[in-house]
From Swiss-Prot:
Membrane topology: Lipid-anchor
Alphabetic keyword roster: Cell adhesion, Cell outer membrane, Lipoprotein, Membrane, Palmitate, Signal, Virulence
Taxonomic placement: Bacteria, Pseudomonadati, Pseudomonadota, Betaproteobacteria, Neisseriales
One biological process term in Gene Ontology: cell adhesion
Protein known as: Adhesin MafA
Region Disordered: start-end pairs: 288-320
Length: 320
């Protein structure tokens, strides 16, 4: 009986226990960014930019339009994982047979009455409601066993409010210009360009995971960069490069056993899934694209976004 009860309880504990991964809200955190995060963010950005296919732009003078998704947010998670014994409880109680005997006192009452030469005799027997003697007997042995498991997990996970650092966007813009230069493609001001290149940075951030599986634990930090780009000939408004997507993920992982270690540390970078929605299937209603490009002033009103400072300066000098 006891074995049949404990076996499913133990099985349920291991199946339904807090073995999972908690993903925190992506954040650079407060204060100075630590070196590992710098390395991952830079690696994912470099890989995404380096993988751009720019063969169609060879020998052309291009103007770059770079837009980066802003990321603002904050989050706080307090308390650990759920308690296992709040969901699964096993208890076995074996109680002995108990018998109690009570002895109640009895008394006899006799009454005699005489009336008109007649005599009556009445006898009654009564029992008191309070026992004079109580005897309790127990047969067999008693036992009690219980099973419970409490896993607190990780608690008090906090994230600081974050805002996209303009230097991050400027760094990404400089990486793009560096790759164009190394590919032999001239990046010039919009006034001197014959080609417009549009680069939209949809994802440029970090993800932190913590995995707990009783014996095995892991900490993982990931950085992702996902972008979409296309190029348009200014003369005939035709697409030189149709919308393409690049997505790369750099990861740093520490493996633990019972949170002792880490016994293994690994780093790597790989292509990841693309954008949930891209523009590769969009076609112009006519034979060419629109006649106007985004305004330099409108798209680069914030320092560090879009063109490099030098490109904006050259554009302004060319248009007094």
């Amino acid at each position: 009986m006891r074995a049949r009860l404990l076996i499913p309880i133990l099985f349920s504990v291991f199946i339904l226990s807090a073995c999972g991964t908690l993903t925190g809200i992506p954040s650079h955190g407060g204060g100075k960014r630590f070196a590992v995060e710098q390395e991952l963010v830079a690696a994912s950005a470099r890989a995404a930019v380096k993988d751009m296919d720019l063969q169609a732009l060879h020998g052309r003078k291009v103007a770059l339009y770079i837009a980066t998704m802003g990321d603002q947010g904050s989050g706080s998670l307090t308390g650990g994982r759920y308690s296992i014994d709040a969901l699964i409880r096993g208890e076995y109680i074996n109680s002995p047979a108990v018998r109690t005997d009570y002895t109640y006192p009895r008394y006899e009452t006799t009454a005699e009455t005489t009336s008109g030469g007649l005599t009556g005799l009445t006898t009654s027997l009564s029992t008191l409601n309070a026992p004079a003697l109580s005897r309790t007997q127990s047969d067999g042995s008693g036992s009690r066993s219980s099973l419970g498991l409490n896993i607190g997990g990780m608690g008090d996970y906090r994230n600081e409010t974050l805002t996209t650092n303009p230097r991050d966007t400027a760094f990404l813009s400089h990486l793009v210009q560096t790759v164009f230069f190394l590919r032999g493609i001239d990046v010039v001001s919009p006034a001197n360009a014959d080609t417009d290149v549009f680069i939209n940075i949809d994802v440029f951030g970090t993800i932190r995971n913590r995995t707990e599986m009783h014996l095995y634990n892991a900490e993982t930090l990931k950085a992702q960069t996902k972008l979409e780009y296309f190029a348009v000939d200014r003369t005939n408004k035709k697409l030189l490069i149709k919308p393409k997507t690049n997505a790369f993920e750099a990861a740093y992982k520490e493996n633990y056993a019972l949170w002792m270690g880490p016994y293994k540390v690994s780093k790597g970078i790989k292509p990841t899934e693309g954008l949930m929605v891209d523009f590769s299937d969009i076609r112009p209603y006519g034979n060419h694209t629109g006649n106007s490009a985004p305004s330099v002033e409108a798209d680069n009103s914030h320092e560090g976004y879009g063109y490099s400072d030098e490109a904006v300066r050259q554009h302004r000098q060319g248009q007094p």
